[in-house]
């Protein structure tokens, strides 16, 4: 049985999405005062791409984008790279329920989006990243849990505000299903 292949459109979206993730992560982030922890606008963009292209694209954009960003700075930090992929994956799972390409991103969908993104970020940054930091790098628990909590909270807020705004703006550019009517003479 042949596996489901990614469309050309999705593959291109992954490449462009990873590149934009890198640019935003490198040049449009705000230091928090906690070592190696910034407020990242790249996760709002990741959320948009995951919502538009689904979980596989979201996972790959987060993973590849974060990997390249780290590789061009201080070197790959695998625990956080993995979490970026997990966050993209989990947010992408709701793409079929949101259907923003149909032009509708009302309060129910905004609430669903933010519940899922907050849960994905919390799981990733409050639990997975710190545990992997301890397992992979033998980092001190108190340090990595503080970093994870700060990163998670800032990402939840950034995606909650900026992500919601850009997804809503995108949805407004799409025609609502059934919005056209036939003219009668």
From Swiss-Prot:
User: What Gene3D superfamilies does this protein map onto?
Assistant: 1.10.1760.20
Q: Chief localization class?
A: membrane
Cystine residue pairs: none
Cross-referenced InterPro entries: ECF_substrate-spec-like, UPF0397
Residue span of the signal peptide, if any? none
| Database matches in Pfam families | ECF-ribofla_trS
Any one annotated GO CC term? plasma membrane
Where is this chain's protein located in or outside the cell? Cell membrane
What keywords were assigned to this record? Cell membrane, Membrane, Transmembrane, Transmembrane helix
Q: How does it sit in the membrane?
A: Multi-pass membrane protein
**Which residue ranges run through the membrane?**
11-31, 44-64, 74-94, 118-138, 149-169
* Superkingdom, natural source: Bacteria
Recorded hits in PANTHER family, A to Z, give: UPF0397 PROTEIN BC_2624-RELATED (PTHR37815), UPF0397 PROTEIN SPR0429 (PTHR37815:SF3)
- Family assignment from sequence similarity: Belongs to the UPF0397 family.
This protein is called what? UPF0397 protein BPUM_3679
């Amino acid at each position: 049985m042949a596996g489901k292949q990614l469309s050309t459109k999705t593959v291109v979206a992954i490449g462009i999405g990873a590149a934009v993730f890198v640019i935003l992560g490198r040049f449009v982030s705000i230091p928090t005062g906690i070592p190696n922890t910034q407020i990242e606008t790249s996760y709002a963009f990741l959320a948009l791409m995951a919502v538009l292209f689904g979980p596989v694209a979201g996972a790959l954009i987060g993973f590849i984008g974060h990997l390249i960003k780290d590789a061009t700075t201080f070197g790959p930090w695998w625990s956080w790279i993995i979490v970026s992929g997990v966050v993209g994956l989990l947010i992408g799972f709701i793409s079929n329920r949101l259907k923003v390409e149909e032009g509708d991103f009302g309060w129910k969908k905004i609430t669903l989006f933010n519940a899922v993104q907050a849960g994905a970020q919390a799981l990733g940054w409050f639990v997975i990243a710190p545990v992997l930091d301890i397992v992979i790098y033998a980092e001190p628990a108190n340090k990595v849990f503080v970093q994870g909590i700060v990163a998670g909270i800032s990402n939840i807020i950034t995606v909650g505000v900026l992500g919601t705004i850009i997804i809503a703006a995108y949805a407004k550019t799409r025609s609502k299903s059934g919005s056209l009517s036939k003219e009668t003479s």
